[in-house]
Each structure stands twice: as structure tokens, then as C-alpha cells.
A protein has these predicted regions:
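Carboxylate-rich, polar loop motifs that coordinate divalent cations or form catalytic acidic clusters
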Residues: 1-139
């Protein structure tokens, strides 16, 4: 469990650095649960082409859109599972969960992607105009 926590902290730091830039330039802002983030346990941070920031957490997704913060959780169709990866293709947002498969955002609700075999997603990457998903197949 300690190694998982260290890994989560490492990736969170790397992604924050990537998105928010050089520490010697500009203004840094730390977002916490008290600021409206779904959870302080962050698994993924993704910036889309509209400059919105999607944060995959232990308790759903938080969308940072300018000055607005929006949370997506069970009431939006997401399972109660860790959101480990967020990506998009042509404006369609996909999320990978730990143990509950992959979901796509349609009309402000997440729907499960049924063609993905295996619910335990290891990673998901957007390469060109395709999404590649690594899962553990189940019998």
C-alpha cells in the first residue's frame, strides 16, 4: 500500500508539473479536496484541446474549466472506483477505472464501453485517432 501511495504522489507531481509549467515562471496553484476536487488521491490529470483540465481521482472526476469546477461521480453514471486515466478523441471524453472498465461521456452522463474485455484497466492511451486500452482479461 505504501508503494502505491508513493507512486500516486509521484505521478501527481509529474502531471502537475507538466500542466502548470515551470516552477520558476508564473503562478502555482494547489488544488485540494477543500477547493472542490473530488478527492486528494489523484491518479491522472489530463488537459484537453479546449484547455479544460480533467482530474481522475479516487472518488470520481473533477473538471476545471476556467473559473468553474465540476464534479462527476455516481450520479453521472461513474462506478465507485478509482478513475485511473482520462483521455479524449474528437471531444469525446473516455475514462478508465480500476476494476470497473472504461466509460465515455455522452450528454453529461458516463456510459460503460461494452466492447472492452476485462474490467481491470492497466492503462489507456490516445495515439492519433485511436485509443489503446490495456486490461487483465477475465475468464
Amino acid at each position: 500500500m505504501l508503494n502505491k501511495t508513493k507512486l500516486i504522489l509521484f505521478y501527481s507531481t509529474v502531471f502537475y508539473t507538466f500542466i502548470f509549467g515551470n516552477p520558476s515562471e508564473g503562478v502555482w496553484k494547489q488544488f485540494l479536496y477543500t477547493d472542490g476536487i473530488s478527492s486528494n488521491y489523484i491518479f491522472d490529470v489530463y488537459k484537453d484541446k479546449k484547455d479544460r483540465v480533467w482530474i481522475g481521482t479516487q472518488n470520481g472526476i473533477t473538471l476545471l474549466d476556467g473559473n468553474n469546477t465540476r464534479k462527476y461521480g455516481a450520479s453521472h453514471g461513474l462506478p465507485s472506483a478509482d478513475i485511473i486515466k482520462v483521455t479524449d478523441i474528437d471531444g469525446r471524453v473516455f475514462v478508465a477505472t480500476s476494476g470497473q472498465g472504461v466509460y465515455v461521456l455522452k450528454n453529461d452522463t458516463f456510459e460503460k464501453v461494452k466492447f472492452v474485455k476485462g474490467s481491470n484497466v492497466n492503462t489507456m492511451e490516445n495515439i492519433g485517432d485511436q485509443i489503446f486500452i490495456s486490461t487483465n482479461l477475465e475468464n
